[in-house]
Structure formats: C-alpha cells, structure tokens
Amino acid sequence: MSRIKSAFERLNGEGRKALIPFITAGDPDAALTLPLMHTLVEAGADVIELGVPFSDPMADGPTIQRASERALARGMTLRKVLQLVVEFRKTDGKTPVVLMGYANPVEAMGLEKFAAAAAQAGVDGVLIVDYPPEEAAAFGAAMKAQGMDPIFLLAPTSSAERIAHVAEIASGYVYYVSLAGVTGSGALNVEAVAERLPLIREKTGLPVGVGFGIRDAATAARIAGIADAVVVGSRIIEEIEKSTAETACANVKALVADIRRGVDEVKK
C-alpha cells in the first residue's frame, strides 16, 4: 500500500481529515528546506506537497512565484529537489511527499528517468500542473509503473467529462482548486465548494483535497467539514517570506499547528 493511501486510511479510521501543507523546495534556501519539511510534520502535516521551482509558474500567484524565483536564484534544480527527499527519508519513512510542479523540468530530465529517480528518492506522488489530464496517459503510466500516485487538479470550471477522466487515471487523491484563478487569489466561497464536491465524488472514490484560498484555522475547519483534505500553500510561503532564517521554522510551526487545530475541529 502506498504511503498516501495508508495515510488517508489511518485518518479515516481516526475520524480525522488530512492536512497537506505546501512549500517550495529551495525557498528561502536549500539549507532550510529540510528543517521546514520536518517542521511541517511536527506541526501536524499528513502529506507534504513540495514545490519544484520553475521560471514560469503560470498557475501560481505572486507569493509562490516569488518563492520559485528565490529558489531558482539560489540554484535549486529538480535533481536537488530529489536529493532533499532522499535526505528527508533518512529520518522520516512515513510521511508522504508529493512533488508539485510543471512539465518542463520533468521533460528535460525525461519522463521515465524522472519517474525512476523520484521513486528511488522516496517520492510518493507527483502533480504536474500543466499536464492536461486528457494528454497525461504516459505521465500516469510512468508514475504508476514506479509505484507513485499521479495526482491531478480539478477546478470549478472542470467539465463532467474531465472529472470522469481524472477519476480513471488518478490515484492517491484528487486536488480540487477552489478558485478559478492562480494560487493565493480571491476569496474562498465554501458554499460553492460544497456544491461542487458531490459531483466529483460521484465519479471517484479517491479522497478529495481542497486548496487555494485557505489562510487560517477557521477556513480550514470549514473546508475540513466538506473535504477529505485541506491544502495550504500561499499562506505558509508568506510566513517564510517575512521570517528570517532563524525564525522561519518556529513561525511556520505555529501557523501550521493552528491550522491543524482548525482541521481537527471536524470529525467524520
């Protein structure tokens, strides 16, 4: 059983929802990424989404774009991201790690080579933002051949056909983008998300995570009431951005622990 599936089954048995925080690898620098990953776990993360920095992150708002720019300026690469996962796995063999990024770095390495290297490093799932599900058969097959979960985005604008297609090829969990925009944008309409999730659950038995626009414990609690997982990214990156190297881990831990408390207000 994959680490992702195991995590969701454990949480389901405990009557709890998953918390999935996102950070960008190499932001603010490579030396702090590993401590931040362990900090996320200490604060209550069930799965870590680790962003692979890219020069043109079209789905990301200004906050995560700046994180990518900082990481790239300090020399972060896809190979170095994988090495960070190797280091993480030396002391954490339980927490699932999902790489989230764009197609270009993966294709530059070669899909099969990337899949093998990621699996060997200890990656559990991969989400490529700019792979349309309809064109992702090779990606999905390559991930599954290496025992990893191909994870896909669904949005408020996703058609019934796209939802059905994602249900066929995805594993691990489905990531529902609660806003039709870039990360960190707009106000989250929880009622609109609640109306949309049953349409997704009609098509798939996979857990559904919801992200984009979740900034505090209260909103996390509301999303946890309707979704299987709460994904938080931009708010954590903001905390890193305004912290020093000395205070980043403590500040992120306090933020994520507070959001964890919000998520845990909800019982299945």
Curated annotation (Swiss-Prot):
Pathway: Amino-acid biosynthesis; L-tryptophan biosynthesis; L-tryptophan from chorismate: step 5/5
Family: Belongs to the TrpA family.
Name of the protein this chain belongs to: Tryptophan synthase alpha chain
Source organism per UniProt: Dechloromonas aromatica (strain RCB)
Function: The alpha subunit is responsible for the aldol cleavage of indoleglycerol phosphate to indole and glyceraldehyde 3-phosphate.
First-tier enzyme category under EC: lyase
PANTHER family: TRYPTOPHAN SYNTHASE ALPHA CHAIN, CHLOROPLASTIC, TRYPTOPHAN SYNTHASE, ALPHA CHAIN
Catalytic-site annotation from UniProt: 49, 60
Keywords for the protein's UniProt record, in alphabetical order: Amino-acid biosynthesis, Aromatic amino acid biosynthesis, Lyase, Tryptophan biosynthesis
Gene Ontology cellular component annotations, sorted alphabetically: cytosol
HAMAP family: Trp_synth_alpha (MF_00131)
